[in-house]
């Protein structure tokens, strides 16, 4: 019987000199790692191994959900019902607890949503307190995520989240204004896509906050 060298089994050279970028796992910061994240993590890591075996240089990217109005909600929740001691002791579980509490209370008091939007605007404007709390939540989450990745025996080359683009939106807005593409609609700023029979592209919300955009970075 012929012996198969398992170390080289399935290896190839068709990928030499080529690069493949794989974006996978991508959990939402301050929320528990669930089965959906596990599925994409396993699939992504399997693709990484296959491409690597074929000679490709593979960049493993974990694009975290680490920016958005939900962090304004979490900051409000932390200030109203949380404590530093509880978060440090219970980590993501405590963050999830107060986040759920926020939504329960917001059903009875809509002003909480206004406060959340205000805190997110502060984050976008570089407010030191807002960003410090957000970074703390993110760091706590990464400790838990990396623990899980270690159990699975995998790593990433880049932990690049939505927040990576937070200082790049202003340039996108300026370029759209220069080209007269930015239109005000119900207090928000959009790019109309009517000629393509598509819904408008939201650029700036009416509260002054933005959506993240990687257009300039990828181009």
Model regions and ranges:
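NTP-dependent nucleotidyl-transfer catalytic core
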Residues: 1-219
